Amino acid sequence: MLRLGALRLRGLALRSSQGRPSSAGLREGQESPPSPPEWKDRAETVIIGGGCVGVSLAYHLAKAGMRDVVLLEKSELTAGSTWHAAGLTTYFHPGINLKKIHYDSIKLYERLEEETGQVVGFHQPGSIRLATTPERVDEFKYQMTRTNWHATEQYIIEPEKIHELFPLLNMDKILAGLYNPGDGHIDPYSLTMALATGARKYGVLLKYPAPVTSLKPRPDGTWDVETPQGSVRANRIVNAAGFWAREVGKMIGLDHPLIPVQHQYVVTSTIPEVKALKRELPVLRDLEGSYYLRQERDGLLFGPYESQEKMKLQASWVAHGVPPGFGKELFESDLDRITEHVEAAMEMVPVLKKADIINIVNGPITYSPDILPMVGPHQGVRNYWVAIGFGYGIIHAGGVGKYLSDWILHGEPPFDLIELDPNRYGKWTTTQYTEAKARESYGFNNIVGYPKEERFAGRPTQRVSGLYKILESKCSMGFHAGWEQPHWFYKPGQDTQYRPSFRRTNWFRPVGSEYKQVMQRVGVIDLSPFGKFNIKGQDSTQLLDHLCANVIPKVGFTNISHMLTPRGRVYAELTVSHQSPGEFLLITGSGSELHDLRWIEEAAVRGGYDVEIRNITDELGVLGVAGPYARRVLQKLTSEDLSDDVFKFLQTKSLKISDIPVTAIRISYTGELGWELYHRREDSAALYERIMNAGQEEGIDNFGTYALNALRLEKAFRAWGSEMNCDTNPLEAGLDYFIKLNKPADFTGKQALKQIKAKGLKRRLVCLTLATDDVDPEGNESVWYKGKVIGNTTSGSYSYSIQKSLAFAYVPVELSEVGQQVEVELLGKNYPATIIQEPLVLTEPTRTRLQKDGRKS
C-alpha cells in the first residue's frame, strides 16, 4: 500500500525549498534581487502582507496607474500559507460571480510569464470532478445550467471519456464527470515572484522584512503605518496578512473572524505507470472520497479534506496569537487523520498502492466561517480594506487583485461579490461561532451543494429574535446574518426533517398552505432580521437626497428607494420612512445590513453632512401581518383608525397595539394588505401572542420566507441580490417607477443613468412561466433560444395560483416581448417558458384603487 519512503518529514522547520512539491524546489520563478533600501514616507496605498494575494493587488494597482504603492511584508515574500500551497487552479466555482474571479486569475497566469520574463510553472492539463452517486450527477447538472451563461468552458462527460483522460482510474463506481479543460496547477512561489517582478516594474515598493508594529488612524482618514524601518502615511491600508490578519486587525480594535486550519497533502515518488504516460494527467477531485489528486512530476500529489470530527484547527493561535517567528514552518504531519481518504484514493487510483511517500506537507491555511474570503472596505473604519481569509488563495489571488484594484481606483466594485463582503460578519460572530463554522466548512468541503442549503454548526448565535423560543419547534429555521428566521412551518404529522434536494421536497406542500393562508385569510411573519438604521440631523434630508434615486417621502410616509453607484448600478434597495421632520428609519435586507451602512456612512463623511447615523438593527423586532383580514385583526388591538382612507398605503404612524408601542408602516412584501410593525425587541413575544390571540376568529397562522418569496414573485416584486445588484442598472431591472431622473438633487449615479437611458438598453428583466415536472427555478439558470444561451434567470419559485413555475430572467431587449417563447435549463433539461405580462397577480393596493375607480365611473 501507499507507504512512507526514505524521506519522512515529521514537523520539521522547513525552508521554502523543502516540504513542497518538487516544482517549487526548482525555483522556476527565482526571485529578482531585493529592492534597494529605499523608503517612502507617503503612499497612496499600503498593503500589509507579501503573500500571493497582497502581491497581486500591488501588481494590479500599479499596472492600472496608481503611484506610491507600498507593500510591507514581515519576513519574506510567500511566507505564511502561499509557499506550501498545492497550487490548484480551476475555472469551477459554485458561486456565480466567483467564477469571474477564477477566470481572471487563470487568464492572468497564462500571460504572466511573457509579461514579466519569470517562469511561473503553470500546468493546464484540465480537471475532472467525479460523480459516483445519482445525487452528485444532479449536482453537476445543476452547476452546468449555472455555468452555461458564463465564459467558463465546462462539460459533463461520460465514463468512457473520463477513462480516456485518466487511464489509471478504477471505473467501477464512476457515473459521470464534470470536466474543465483549462484547469490545472501552478507553482505558488514562482507565481508570487512573477507578480512581484511585475509590481516592481510598475513602480511598487516591496519592503521586507518590514513588520507592521502599529496602525494609527488620523482625523483626515489617512493612516500612519509604523514599522522598525520607519513610518509611512497612507491614504488607505489593505490588510492582506494571511494568518496574521487577526493580529493586524487587533491593532485597530477589530477581531476578524478567521482561524488557521491544518491542511495536509502527500507527495509520492515516481510511479512507473505515471511516468509511462505521454501527457500530464488531469487534476482529479473525488468528491465522495473528499480529496484532490494531481500529477507531480512522475508521481502524484494527494490532498484530503478530513471530516469535521477529525480535522484540526489551530485554535491556540486564536487564543494566544500566531507564534512570532512562524513564517515558513510546517506542523507535524498526521497520517492517521487521513487514513480513510488514503484508502479511498488507493481504491480509485490503484497505482497508489505501490507508491512511496517522499513528502508530507501539513501547513496552515486561513478559514473564515463560511470558507469564503473577506474582500473590500470594512465598515466602521475609514480607508481600511481587507483581502483575507483565503482558503483557496492561489486561484483567488489574481482575480481578487484585479477586482480590489478596480474597486479602489473607481470607487465601486466592478461586479457584485457581496458573498465576499467583510461586512457580512458582525459583533455576533464570536470566536466560538468562527471555530464551529470553520470546522464545519472544512469538513463539508466536498459535500453535495444543494439549493436552499442550510448548515447548522454554531447556531443559534446571540442574535435571535424575541420569537425564537416560541417558533423553533414549529418551523424550519434559516440563517440570515446571524439571525434565525422561519423558512417554513410544519403541522403535527408532517415531515419536519431538513431534506435538501434539487427537486421539490418536504417543504413544498406546507409552503403552499402558507401561501393560501396569506392570500385568503391572514398570516404573521417574523421580519426581525431586517437591517434598521436611524438617521437624523440638520443635513439628514440632503444626505438621503444625495444617496437615493427616488424623492424623499413626506413626513409620515414611506417609499422604496435605491442607492446607485457612480456607474448607475444598484448598490442597495431601501425602505425609507420619514418618521418626523429630519428623522428617518431606513430598512434593508438582513444580508445587506453593514454593506449598506458602510456606504451611507462613507457618503456622510465624504460630503461633510451634519447627521447622526445609528444602527438599531438589534434594538428592534419586526412583525409582518398580511392578508385580507390583516386590518380586521389589528383593529381589534388598537384605537388608531386603520381604514384605507385614514391609514393609507405607504403611510407610517406611531401607535400602540394592545398597549405595546410600535411604528406601523402600511407595506408588505407579500403584495397583500399588510403592515410591518417595528417594536422593541423585548416586546416581540408579547406582541406576537396578542396578535395571534386576536386573530383566532379570522384563522390567523404563521408563514415563512419561502411563501413570502412565492408571493412577491407573483406580484413581480424585485429582490436586491437577485434581480438587482452591482451588476445591474435600475432601468433594465424594471425599476423606472422608483428612479426620479428629474428630481433636483444630483444623486449618485444620476448622470451615468442618463447616459444609459440615452444609449438604450441591451437587456431587460422579464417574468416567465414554465411548465416543469418536479423541479423549479432557483435563479442563475441558463435561458436558451434557438439552441443558444441568451440570458439567465435571477430567482424563481412555484406559483401556487397557476400551478406552474415562475421566474424572473434577463434576456436581450429584442426577445423581451410578452408572449415570447424561450427555454430554461433545469437539471440538464430545457423546459419551454413564456414571457408574461407582469405582475401575474395584482397587488392589493392596485386592486383597491381599481375598485374605487370602477365605483367612480
From Swiss-Prot:
GO terms for molecular function: dimethylglycine dehydrogenase activity; flavin adenine dinucleotide binding; folic acid binding. Gene3D superfamilies: Aminomethyltransferase beta-barrel domains, D-Amino Acid Oxidase, subunit A, domain 2, FAD/NAD(P)-binding domain, Probable tRNA modification gtpase trme, domain 1. Binds 1 FAD covalently per monomer. It holds the Pfam family FAO_M. The modification Tele-8alpha-FAD histidine is found at H84. The modification N6-succinyllysine is found at K141, K310, K312, K427, K469, K516, K648, K786, K788. One of its GO terms (biological process) is tetrahydrofolate interconversion. The keyword Ion transport does not apply. (6S)-5,6,7,8-tetrahydrofolate binds at E573, L574, T575, Y669, E676, L677, Y678, Y737. Residues 1-43 form a transit peptide. It catalyses: (6S)-5,6,7,8-tetrahydrofolyl-(gamma-L-Glu)(n) + N,N-dimethylglycine + oxidized [electron-transfer flavoprotein] + H(+) = (6R)-5,10-methylenetetrahydrofolyl-(gamma-L-Glu)(n) + sarcosine + reduced [electron-transfer flavoprotein]. Keywords: Acetylation, FAD, Flavoprotein, Mitochondrion, Oxidoreductase, Transit peptide. Pathway: Amine and polyamine degradation; betaine degradation; sarcosine from betaine: step 2/2. The modification N6-acetyllysine is found at K107, K141, K161, K216, K328, K353, K427, K469, K516, K648, K757, K786. Residues 15-39 are annotated as: Disordered. Its cofactor is FAD. It is found in: Mitochondrion. GO terms for cellular component: cytoplasm; mitochondrial matrix; mitochondrion. FAD binds at residues 52-53, 73-74, 80-88, 212, 244, 390-395. Its main location: mitochondrion. SUPFAM superfamilies: Aminomethyltransferase beta-barrel domain (SSF101790), FAD-linked reductases, C-terminal domain (SSF54373), FAD/NAD(P)-binding domain (SSF51905), Folate-binding domain (SSF103025). Its EC number is 1.5.8.4. Belongs to the GcvT family. Catalyzes the demethylation of N,N-dimethylglycine to sarcosine. Also has activity with sarcosine in vitro. This is Dimethylglycine dehydrogenase, mitochondrial. It comes from Rattus norvegicus (Rat). The gene is Dmgdh.
